[in-house]
């Protein structure tokens, strides 16, 4: 099973043990080795973490968001994630819920307290910005799913090896095959020793990336490495979203009721 690992909101893709470097390996074999780690050494059932998001626009403006993220894994590679915004006042009480499915688009809902209404994110709205950040609703789904995509989801190829921030990495190109995915290709830099993503680039029709994601400041929570600093950049807009993670904890025996749509209005437990 190709288990999805989280960014974010984090996204949150994780790695642990050092694999043996095999020069003859294909991209698929590398991704399968990562999957094996996710199902053994790095396996977890649920998690929570605090996130601080700083959104910088192309004109020099800056906004901050504080939120709590809760997530659980289900059999068959399914995930359920809920996010509660805590500050500032204009977004406090906003909540987001996602059911991530293997091989198909996620189901997503957004609760807006000023409207006292929960709306499901329609397919046509998945490329819209997620609460004013550099991430779209579809990006949240892709970042969780992509390292576990099958060959039916995306063609994979190994472009070589590069060093990112002093870390040797595999450079893997993914070409999505599903019509619901907006990007023409995604390039992923995976740490050679821990298979932890260090960089992502998302491409449309042009030769330059439309979005870049960089992960840094990795630390272990038990056997699970977590990126405490993530930057998401949209070059054409000159904007950047910085995500800082703290207080990450795994296997907390979270109540399944926390992941129902009615929990969006109830708020953080």
Give each language-model segment a name.
Residues 86, 97-101, 107-111, 117-121, ...:
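Gly/Pro-enriched, hydrophobic low-complexity segments
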Residues 69-73, 155-163, 216-218:
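Short amphipathic beta-strand and strand-loop transition segments with alternating hydrophobic
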Residues 268-269:
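Short, solvent-exposed mixed-charge patches
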Residues 25-117, 157:
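N-terminal mature ectodomain segment of secretory-pathway/periplasmic proteins
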Residues 8-16:
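Bacterial N-terminal signal peptides
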Residues 19-23:
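Sec/Tat signal peptide C-region and signal peptidase I cleavage site
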Residues 28-31, 63-65, 143-158, 207-212:
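A short, amphipathic edge element
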Residues 1-9:
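Bacterial N-terminal signal peptides that target proteins for export
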């Amino acid at each position: 099973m190709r288990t999805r690992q989280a960014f974010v909101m984090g996204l949150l893709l994780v790695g642990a043990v050092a694999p043996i470097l095999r020069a003859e390996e294909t991209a698929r074999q590398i991704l399968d080795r990562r999957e094996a780690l996710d199902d053994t050494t790095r396996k977890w059932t649920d998690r929570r973490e605090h996130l601080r998001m700083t959104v910088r626009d192309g004109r020099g403006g800056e906004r901050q968001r504080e939120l709590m993220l809760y997530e659980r894994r289900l059999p068959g590679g399914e995930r359920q994630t809920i996010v509660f915004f805590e500050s500032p006042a204009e977004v406090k009480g906003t909540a987001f819920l996602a059911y991530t499915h293997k091989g198909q688009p996620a189901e997503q809902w957004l609760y807006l307290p000023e409207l006292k209404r929960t709306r499901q994110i329609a397919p046509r709205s998945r490329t819209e910005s997620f609460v004013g950040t550099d991430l779209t609703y579809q990006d949240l789904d892709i970042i969780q799913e992509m390292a576990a995509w099958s060959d039916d989801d995306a063609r994979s190829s190994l472009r070589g090896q590069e060093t990112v921030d002093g870390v040797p990495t595999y450079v893997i190109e993914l070409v999505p095959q599903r019509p619901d995915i907006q990007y023409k290709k995604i390039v992923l830099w995976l740490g050679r020793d821990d298979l932890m993503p260090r960089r992502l680039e998302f491409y449309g029709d042009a030769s330059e990336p439309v979005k870049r994601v960089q992960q840094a400041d990795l630390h272990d929570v038990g056997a699970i490495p977590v990126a405490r600093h993530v930057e998401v950049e949209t070059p054409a807009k000159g904007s950047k979203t910085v995500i800082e993670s703290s207080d990450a904890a795994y296997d907390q025996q979270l109540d399944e009721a926390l992941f129902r749509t009615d929990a969006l209005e109830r708020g953080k437990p």
